[in-house]
UniProtKB/Swiss-Prot annotation:
Its main location: membrane. It is found in: Cell membrane; Membrane; Perikaryon; Cell projection, Dendrite. One of its GO terms (cellular component) is dendrite. GO terms for biological process: G protein-coupled acetylcholine receptor signaling pathway; negative regulation of signal transduction; positive regulation of GTPase activity; regulation of dopamine receptor signaling pathway. The lineage of its organism: Eukaryota, Metazoa, Chordata, Craniata, Vertebrata. Residues 72-188 form the RGS domain. GO terms for molecular function: GTPase activator activity; GTPase activity. It comes from the Eukaryota. This is Regulator of G-protein signaling 8. It is a peripheral membrane protein. It comes from Macaca fascicularis (Crab-eating macaque). InterPro entries: RGS (IPR016137), RGS_RGS8 (IPR034949), RGS_sf (IPR036305), RGS_subdom1/3 (IPR024066), RGS_subdomain_2 (IPR044926).
Amino acid sequence: MAALLMPRRNKGMRTRLGCLSHKSDSCSDFTAILPDKPNRALNYLRMYKFTATELQESRRLSTEEATRWADSFDVLLSHKYGVAAFRAFLKTEFSEENLEFWLACEEFKKTRSTAKLVSKAHRIFEEFVDVQAPREVNIDFQTREATRKNMQEPSLTCFDQAQGKVHSLMEKDSYPRFLRSKMYLDLLSQSQRRLS
């Protein structure tokens, strides 16, 4: 009964913890973050649902490209495989909602239809910003309330403040950890080995 009273956002964590305690084969959510060959960075890309074409292209990732991800967080976000590698890293920390929100906002800004804009805005708000949202992002009360007010008349800029806060949080917190992670260092190492 107590499990029913837990907030929806804890559902994913409960599933993963349940998988650990029961070692269930049906727990694909959790097995995806346990690489069978932890020394192979490309396995991370496989585990996080890259298509066969994307995997083939990722094998051509140059050392220069992967090294540039360390230049700045925005450089990482501008590179397709940088985003994929960062997403895989965030999944291992159970914090991919920040990147997913940022990406949803970027996609939202491309919306041209007014009717679609309103429905997309409400979907993003309910998924990421609202209190107890399934994938609630970590933003302060003032930002959440300002975004809530923006929902009264959604526009292409209605998430700008919240997106900026999430970007800053990832840049100051998750991004430095990613650059120090074994996963990123393995990607660099593998791309260097392919050149040799």
